[in-house]
């Protein structure tokens, strides 16, 4: 069959010029084009298997209403293994499209439903694999999703990844955090858990100088982590080291995202979406300053490097030496990091027709050791 | 082939030897507050419970004894967030480990050593006190 080749859109052309690349433990796409502007993505692996995943989807957001065009961005920071974050990357966007098609529009409910169904389906997979692969019950992931559509940006978050908006202001740029985070080291997250579990004195335990839910996990909401959601998974054959010692009846973690909706103004330059591996080393303001003051090409990799330099400093070593460390043992020096920078154009890229649909999945192929 | 009993016996012997060394070895201390955080080329840094700073060549990260050491450090203190890696052992024990690693042990000896590390950790837990970081420095090559 002959494929039409005369309808290559701007996004396609850009992809050819700036393809996705892998350099050692770094995966990146220095510059691409989404519906409302340019974007840049970069990831670095520290765990023996990359647990972070990410994606960007641009084009129609429903199956039945071509006027609903937009950009979907997802950052998924897995823990206990890569299965949950990979599952989200495979499933959440098709689900979002399905629910958006029902109402023929994007809404907070549509996004929340996509999160809920992704979690529900992952737990179904855990059930299916329970007899042969019970440790799937201890795998989970944070899920940060951004949808830019109709002059609005929806940020939905379960876990502790973060989205920060860069808003130009008096010659500089101001950081506006768009995501609400769920980490036990935030007072708000602790209050929420204590009020949900008033009769459990060990719902939050301080371990290694950090608050952890039941003494095991820092995030207070997540996708997966079946053993903390349903008591039926908190038992044999799941290995004792992954189990809670006591029985519970009420789910300890939930998958509900916190959603914020922001109307974009011409002052809004870009949004940075990243896993906590980045924010551990860079403040919101430091990150937006770097993006504001640097060329767009390769900006995600630049942020990654800034975070790694900071990580090296904390470990009292040189950045060049840090980059030599193999995955696995590298986790003692920094976490897996994913960063996506989405630039916001006040007007869609093409005014007469929509930019070509775009779909990029971050992190493939990636190094893996046993 | 060695049996487990023999391995444990060996491990105990090493611990006794380590205890003997503890009495003899003393560390050079730098007299003034130096720029102790200067990064040595090709090295990573581990602090001990008695606040001695060790800088190891990166190649040590592929040694199984050192990987075990990092694992134990993670179990003991969690992954470090705002600072350097701290081992749950004191400088004397770490010094002793280095000597063994430098001697290039055979597989059986290494196995026994790994067991010994784990048991030493259990006994060191009660006396774990993080002291103020001093200016002691140690470069191991």
Swiss-Prot record, chain A:
Gene Ontology terms, MF aspect: metal ion binding; phosphatase activity; protein serine/threonine phosphatase activity
Gene3D superfamilies for the chain: PPM-type phosphatase domain (3.60.40.10)
Cofactor remark from the record: Binds 2 magnesium or manganese ions per subunit.
Membrane topology note: Peripheral membrane protein
Record: residues binding Mn(2+) 1: 77-78
InterPro entries given in the database record: PP2C, PP2C_BS, PPM-type-like_dom_sf, PPM-type_phosphatase-like_dom
Cellular component annotations (GO), alphabetically ordered: cytoplasm; plasma membrane
Loss of function: phenotype: Reduced apical hook maintenance in etiolated seedlings. The pp2c-d1 pp2c-d2 double mutant displays a long hypocotyl phenotype and strongly reduced apical hook maintenance in etiolated seedlings.
Record keywords, A-Z: Cell membrane, Hydrolase, Magnesium, Manganese, Membrane, Metal-binding, Protein phosphatase
Location (main, coarse): membrane
Chain residues that bind Mn(2+) 2: 77, 276, 335
Alphabetized SUPFAM superfamilies for the sequence: PP2C-like
Coiled-coil region(s): none
The enzyme's E.C. designation: 3.1.3.16
Family: Belongs to the PP2C family.
Subunit structure, as described in the record: Interacts with SAUR19. Interacts with AHA2 at the plasma membrane.
Name by which UniProt lists this protein: Probable protein phosphatase 2C 67
Organism of derivation: Arabidopsis thaliana
Organism taxonomic ancestry: Eukaryota, Viridiplantae, Streptophyta, Embryophyta, Tracheophyta
UniProtKB/Swiss-Prot annotation, chain B:
Coiled coil: none
Keywords (A to Z) from UniProt: Auxin signaling pathway, Cell membrane, Developmental protein, Growth regulation, Membrane
Biological processes annotated in GO: auxin-activated signaling pathway
Protein's membrane topology: Peripheral membrane protein
GO CC annotations, alphabetized: plasma membrane
Pfam families: Auxin_inducible
Major subcellular site: membrane
InterPro entries xrefs: SAUR_fam (IPR003676)
Disulfide bonds: none
Superkingdom of the organism of origin: Eukaryota
Subcellular location, record wording: Cell membrane
Functional note: May promote auxin-stimulated organ elongation, such as hypocotyls, stamen filaments and petals.
Similarity comment: Belongs to the ARG7 family.
Record protein name field: Auxin-responsive protein SAUR64
